Amino acid sequence: AFQSYIAREGMVTGGTGARVRPVTSCKGTTCVFGLYDTQALARELHQRFYEGCHSLALPHKFKIAVGGCPNNCVKPELNDLGLVGQRVPQYKPEFCRGCKKCQVAEVCPMKAAALPQGEKMVLDAARCNHCGRCASACPFGALACGETRYKVYVGGRWGKEIRIGTPLSALVAREEVPAVVERAILLFQREGLPG
């Protein structure tokens, strides 16, 4: 009776075991820091990989987390595969007016933007975490951010032996995300270790 009831309601059981687990997401869709619709992406990945690959045998569980910004509230880097929204700033120094109180430097939580006295703004790319808060800070358009891209972490783990996932070397576009996730799952199926 229970199985027929949940089938009528479009639900499935069995979210445990050596398979793709239900996809988790932060509230980036409604969060002030969220850079994209995390719920929509999580739903898409959940349908394609949790529901669509439900019978795919894996050597161990495979967890996917979808994070809306570099705050990492859902801890994507501690999952088998984690996605983090990124907005990479493009600095146009020709538009910088060297304002006494640089709005970009004021809003940057990483202190990646600085204004040496009497000079134009300097952006330290190594300090920038691509949170996008600076995107519209400069009233003269010296800094802008393009479309949201995604940092992909692979191989993260939480528990007795913690491992921070390794970020892929390049950010990926939205349309590339499902293919990247699929390749990671298939690689894990072929070469992953049990336990």
Task: Walk through the language-model features, giving the residues of each.
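A hydrophobic, small-residue-rich beta->alpha segment in the mid-to-C-terminal subdomain
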Residues: 156-195
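A generic structural motif
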Residues: 1, 30-33, 87-89, 119, ...
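Active-site lining segments that contact anionic ligands and/or coordinate catalytic metals
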Residues: 78, 140, 147-149, 163-167
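Iron-sulfur cluster-binding cysteine motifs and their immediate structural context
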Residues: 101-123, 133-149
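Cysteine-rich micro-motifs
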Residues: 128, 132
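Short beta-strand elements
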Residues: 80-85, 150-157
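Small-residue-enriched alpha-helical segments and adjacent helix-cap loops
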Residues: 1-101, 107, 127
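Generic secondary-structure signature for well-ordered alpha-helical cores
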Residues: 4-7, 11, 47-54, 109-113, ...
